[in-house]
């Protein structure tokens, strides 16, 4: 492990590889305890999370549901509950996966907010967008989608006196692969510190459908490239990112890409600058 790898892994509080199944189970329990303690300490009773159909939201959603079920059993307070939210932009091309995820998560309550009208309405009011190339405009509007989804989730949470869960984990955090004040905004991030294959391992252990566990990750924000794989955007694979974060050898090219991207996206992981 290079000094830079160690520095980045420490900054992201990366969880070491699971030594065995017992370590995996212990990590699941630790994260459920974190969710339960966060709720109890907040004095609130409701969790809210957008479900996309990917492995990250599937895993975080199931952990959230299990946590509120345990809280109800432990406290006798039936007000603890989890709201899973679908946030499509018009019709999602992999809606079947989102529905499979919802079925697996088995949330106490489900809600749907189609963000298309809000995204279009805002985009039409911002004249600066019309000056951009098609590709640049598509990228900017992709970030608008992520931020509108954040607004919707926090609106639901506010209406129910709840907290918003985020799905960020170490393999995305190191690449800054989230929208600032969009999907990066949340009250608690129960997958933090995990690398991608650890998220998959937790999902599999919890019983998630295999096609969701192994699904190709995509942010799916761009109209010109629907379903664009994360790894294509990264320029490296999740296997390489995971190996880097766990201090293992990666190619010189992968190492340089990860370090360069980490440095370039530092602003996403920090609080706003002040004088």
Curated annotation (Swiss-Prot):
GO terms for cellular component: cytoplasm. The keyword Thylakoid does not apply. Its EC number is 6.3.1.5. Deamido-NAD(+) binds at residues 147, 180, 187, 267-268. InterPro entries: NAD/GMP_synthase (IPR022310), NAD_synthase (IPR003694), NH(3)-dep_NAD(+)_synth (IPR022926), Rossmann-like_a/b/a_fold (IPR014729). One of its GO terms (biological process) is NAD biosynthetic process. Keywords: ATP-binding, Ligase, Magnesium, Metal-binding, NAD, Nucleotide-binding. PANTHER family: NH 3 /GLUTAMINE-DEPENDENT NAD + SYNTHETASE, NH(3)-DEPENDENT NAD(+) SYNTHETASE. NCBIfam families: nadE (TIGR00552), PRK00768.1 (NF001979). This is NH(3)-dependent NAD(+) synthetase. The gene is nadE.
């Amino acid at each position: 492990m290079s000094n830079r790898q160690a520095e980045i892994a420490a900054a992201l509080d990366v969880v070491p590889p699971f030594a065995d199944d017992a370590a995996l189970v212990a990590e699941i329990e630790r994260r459920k305890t974190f969710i339960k303690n966060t709720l109890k300490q907040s004095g609130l009773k409701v969790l809210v999370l957008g479900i996309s159909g990917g492995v990250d939201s599937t895993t975080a959603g199931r952990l959230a549901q299990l946590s509120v079920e345990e809280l109800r059993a432990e406290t006798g307070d039936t007000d603890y509950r989890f709201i899973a939210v679908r946030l499509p932009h018009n019709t999602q091309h992999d809606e079947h996966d989102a529905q499979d995820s919802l079925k697996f998560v088995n949330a106490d309550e489900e809600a749907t907010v189609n963000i298309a009208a809000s995204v279009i309405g805002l985009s039409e009011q911002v004249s600066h967008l019309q000056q951009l190339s098609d590709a640049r405009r598509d990228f900017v509007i992709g970030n608008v989608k992520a931020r509108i989804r954040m607004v919707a989730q926090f609106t639901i949470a506010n209406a129910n006196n709840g907290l918003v869960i985020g799905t960020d984990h170490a393999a995305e955090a190191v690449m800054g692969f989230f929208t600032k004040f969009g999907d990066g905004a949340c009250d608690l991030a129960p997958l933090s510190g995990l690398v991608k294959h650890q998220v998959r391992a937790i999902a599999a252990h919890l019983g998630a459908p295999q096609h969701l566990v192994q699904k190709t990750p995509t942010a799916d924000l761009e109209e010109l490239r629907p379903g664009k794989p994360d790894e294509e955007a990264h320029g490296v694979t999740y296997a390489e990112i995971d190996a880097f974060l766990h201090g293992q050898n990666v190619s010189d090219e992968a190492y340089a890409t990860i370090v360069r991207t980490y440095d370039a996206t530092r602003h996403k992981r920090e609080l706003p600058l002040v004088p």
